Amino acid sequence: MSLITCENLTLAYDTGVVASGVSFTLEAGSYLCIVGENGSGKSTLLKSVIGLHPVDGGTLTVDPSVRKSGIGYLPQHTPAQRDFPASVREIVRSGCLKRSGLCPFWRASDKKLADEAMARMGIDHLAGRCYRELSGGQQQRVLLARAYCATGKLILLDEPIAGLDPMAMTEMYRMIADLNREGVAVVMVSHDVSAAVQYATHILHMGKTTSFFGTTEAYLATPVGQQFARREGGSYGDWNPKTAWDAPDIGRILDVRAAPDARSVLGARGVSLNRNLTATRRRGGAASNREGEDT
């Protein structure tokens, strides 16, 4: 069952297009990591899924049952959020607002769900504390608990580990993985490629002129996937997109219909990923098929 279907999507602001030609599907229970250079439209894509940003081209379809039951959303952490003057319990319960409808008070089921969410995130002892008094890691746990209360099907996370210390990062990844193992589909924007390939079932790589979608295994079979998997920490901080994507061995892949687990867009014309990978295996090195390469 597809929860999200995206076909040839274009996203833009008044200043111009930030992403184009983006295509992917998210199946129930999947774990999708969205990676890519800064400014490539990753956060904007999440906002479009929940209806906070319009689509400028292509189609973006969210399963009606998911929209009805709610989508959990953990946005990027901002200074305004860190200073929010509310208790942990109040913030977590606010995740139940959509399911509560017009009910003017918290139902017993809402309170129970919020209590369960706080317990599983290890913050039940902080229920009465003010949110702005907590550490960054504790605040992220609160927001993850809130997102969990909003849905049992789909959670969108925008750089949930940004600014966390290594121990807090490990705990956050573990809790997200636990939710996914219980059947909750996860879409996470991250610059931590090493973690993305460790936890995700699928990778969406977004760039100003490039887009890849496929299984983690297919991503790691591409030269660019291998390059980033080797990078310590998987950070994009000093990545040069021209060096990575304009290298002769990357080819120009447009539509991989022969490999259902991978669809890629690189430039205006394309060749099969299977042909590129086959050439790589035969030659024991980088694929040299440059058919369709921009001139």
Predicted feature locations:
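Catalytic Walker B motif of ABC-type/P-loop ATPase nucleotide-binding domains
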Residues: 155-158
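Conserved ABC ATPase "signature" region
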Residues: 108-126
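H-loop (His-switch) and adjacent beta-strand-loop-beta switch element
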Residues: 203-215
